[in-house]
Amino acid sequence: MSKVLIVEDDPLVSRMYQTVFQFEGFDVEMARNGEEGIEKLKSFKPIMILLDIMMPKMSGIDVLRIIKNNPDLKNIPVVVLTNLSGDKDVDTALDLGAVKYIVKSQNKPKEIVAQIKEILAGYTREEIPKAATKN
């Protein structure tokens, strides 16, 4: 099963995306803020991270920097999923290594899932990080 980490501070939005992704067959782990997202990555190795930008404790941009500067995490594709639609926000996220920038208010949840599946289909098995296994 494909593991996805969703880092989102809004509980209603978080629950909605968790439900939609689980319905589509994803194993979903949730984090309520950037710090929690980084902490969860110590034990949960997803094949993709969905990351909000505006969050308490640590912004999504700061989380993205940490992920892309960590040799163990930098190859995990990160999709920014936010309501910020300014060109500067988009450029910053993509320059830091996000593979896609999706504005939540401009896409239905099922459309977002379809975009995520399309992105994942573009990676070969060797490029997608393997999920953590129990030894």
Q: What is the role of each PLM region?
A:
Residues 8:
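Conserved acidic carboxylate
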Residues 11-29:
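Two-component/phosphorelay signaling modules centered on CheY-like receiver
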Residues 30-39, 60:
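Helix N-cap/capping motif at the beta->alpha junctions
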Residues 39, 61-74:
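Short amphipathic alpha-helix used as the core "switch/output" element in two-component signaling
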Residues 44-50:
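Active-site beta3 strand of CheY-like receiver
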Residues 52, 82:
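Active-site residues of response regulator receiver
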Residues 55-58:
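Receiver (REC) domain active-site loop signature in two-component systems and cognate sites
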